[in-house]
């Protein structure tokens, strides 16, 4: 019954829109958070520390509120959670923050916008979770062209490609796309909500350690920054959990 309900077009569309709205609200919150926590735009180490705290808290929320108290991983599920932590949190955000300091906003948005299309390609050609048909290829081309046009906005786009800038953003995007395919694969064997919570905690812990070792730090005054951090954790917890459930019952291209 739950599977049929989660496969209804209106349900898929509605939940996917919620995910997109939550992820969209994260970007302005991140900028506000940097101001509240006194983090410079080029301070990648402090940004990693900040992201680690956010994701660790998100993992705690998912496990406490989304697993009905049964948050223990089986031995066979530990490698799954670790794999998701590597691709969905660690690689994605380490390379994103590192690359963002050396890439233009336009190029970063274009490369990051290719995520949805990379998910289809990776799920089809590498994980063989669905067939890559002509309409899907055409849809990817048209969709990516739309992303490019929207992000150009009259600004010039040079063809330069820096290994520590655009290339890092590309690695981040590919990593995020791979994580969607892994979620689809693992959700047939384990509870995606449980995996989501643990991967957030594992990935968040690694980001916190990396940020601290690189000299990251932040400071804040008052209680407002803590409420913002809690909201950002809720964004990740709700959006990624819903996305995991959608991928469990639907093909990635849908």
Where are these regions (language model features)?
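Membrane-interface helix caps of multi-pass small-molecule transporters
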Residues: 32, 64-67, 94, 98, ...
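Glycine-/small-residue-enriched transmembrane alpha-helix faces in small-molecule transporters
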Residues: 1-49, 158-185, 205, 209, ...
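Loop-to-transmembrane alpha-helix entry segments
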Residues: 76, 109-112, 128-149, 159-165, ...
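Specific transmembrane alpha-helical segments of multi-pass solute transporters/efflux pumps
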Residues: 26, 63, 67-112, 149, ...
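Hydrophobic residues within alpha-helical transmembrane segments
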Residues: 14, 18, 52-57, 79, ...
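Hydrophobic transmembrane alpha-helices of multi-pass small-molecule transport proteins
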Residues: 62, 121-122, 134-154, 207
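Specific alpha-helical transmembrane segments that line the substrate/conduction pathway
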Residues: 49-52, 56-60, 88, 92-93, ...
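Transmembrane alpha-helices of multi-pass small-molecule transport proteins
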Residues: 30, 35-90, 118-122, 175-179, ...
């Amino acid at each position: 019954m739950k599977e049929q309900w989660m496969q209804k077009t209106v349900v898929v569309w509605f939940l996917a829109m919620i995910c997109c709205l939550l992820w969209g609200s994260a970007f302005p919150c991140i900028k506000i958070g940097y101001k509240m926590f006194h983090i410079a735009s080029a301070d990648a180490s402090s940004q990693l520390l900040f992201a680690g705290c956010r994701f660790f808290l998100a993992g705690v929320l998912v496990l406490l509120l989304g697993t009905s108290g049964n948050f223990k991983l089986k031995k066979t599920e530990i490698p799954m959670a670790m794999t998701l932590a590597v691709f969905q949190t660690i690689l994605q955000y380490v390379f994103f923050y590192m690359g963002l300091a050396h890439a233009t906003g336009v190029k970063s948005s274009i490369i990051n916008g290719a995520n949805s299309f990379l998910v289809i390609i990776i799920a089809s050609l590498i994980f063989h979770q669905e067939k890559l048909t002509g309409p899907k290829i055409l849809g990817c081309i048209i969709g990516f062209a739309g992303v490019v046009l929207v992000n150009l906005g009259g600004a010039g786009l040079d063809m330069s490609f820096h290994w520590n800038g655009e290339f890092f953003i590309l690695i981040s995007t590919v990593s995020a796309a791979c994580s969607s395919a892994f979620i689809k694969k693992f959700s047939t064997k384990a509870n995606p909500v449980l995996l989501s919570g643990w991967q957030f905690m594992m990935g968040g812990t690694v980001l916190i350690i990396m940020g601290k070792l690189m000299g990251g730090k932040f400071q804040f005054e008052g209680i407002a920054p803590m409420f913002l951090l809690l909201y950002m954790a809720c964004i990740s917890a709700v959006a990624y959990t819903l996305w995991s459930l959608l991928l469990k019952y639907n093909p990635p291209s849908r």
